[in-house]
Design a protein with these regions (language model features):
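Extended amphipathic ligand-handling, pore-lining, and cofactor/metal-binding catalytic surfaces
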Residues: 1-212
Length: 212
């Protein structure tokens, strides 16, 4: 009705998960209404085949998110935080979708960058090494005594405020405290979408698909 002939869709999803698939279904249903339809990559880019596969998007997100978390926690560098016994946990949603490997890839990316004190977790505990219990064990075994929890989500909504930082016994904050392994557990309630450098990745993805 508005005379648009060429449609470009920029998903604001984190990855190629179930909601991205639903978007693709919706867009494809209207594809014949336009001369061209292009859908850009979500934040973490292409999924890749296994847990060891990383890409430029994952590296950029890992660096940007970690730098933001370190700064918010009051440290000059990740090394300074590590020296003070601090571990950072970035908590995603988790999924049974095949895209769950993206979380494992983000952990691989952190390891590749030498971010020894950064751990990836998920609310759903899928993949299983991202469950709250698994992450608590990993951090305790590594010897860190202070923990900072922060969402690995575009928007810090219900999951961040309740599942991560809520007062219920089954929140991550409560379970980390209840484990008795840590001297302090702090939370940072900020979504990825609030960070200008993250916004720039989405814009770059839009530009890339327009220029294809």
């Amino acid at each position: 009705a508005n005379g648009v002939k060429n449609l470009v869709v920029q998903p604001t999803h984190l990855m190629h998960g179930a909601e991205y698939d639903e978007l693709m279904e919706t867009v494809s249903a209207y594809a014949d209404k336009f001369e061209s339809v292009k859908v850009a990559e979500p934040l973490l880019g292409e999924v890749g085949s296994d847990a060891a596969v990383v890409n430029e998007d994952k590296q950029a997100v890992a660096q940007i998110l970690t730098a933001e978390a370190v700064k918010t926690a009051g440290y000059d560098s990740l090394d300074a935080a590590k020296a003070d016994g601090v571990a950072f946990v970035f908590m995603g949603h988790g999924t049974s979708h095949t895209a769950k490997v993206s979380y494992s890839q983000m952990q691989s990316q952190m390891n590749e960058l030498g971010y020894d004190n950064v751990f990836i977790g998920t609310v759903e505990g899928e993949p299983e090494e991202t469950s709250c219990e698994a992450v608590i064990d990993a951090i305790a075994q590594a010897g860190y005594k202070k923990v900072v929890l922060r969402p690995l989500m575009v928007v810090a909504g219900d999951h961040a405020n309740n599942d991560m930082a809520g007062s219920d016994d089954d929140s991550w904050l409560s379970m980390f405290n209840a484990s008795g392994n840590f001297d302090s557990v702090d939370t940072q309630i900020f979504g990825l979408g609030e960070i200008p450098e993250i916004q720039a990745i989405y814009v770059a993805h839009t530009g890339a698909v327009i220029n294809q």
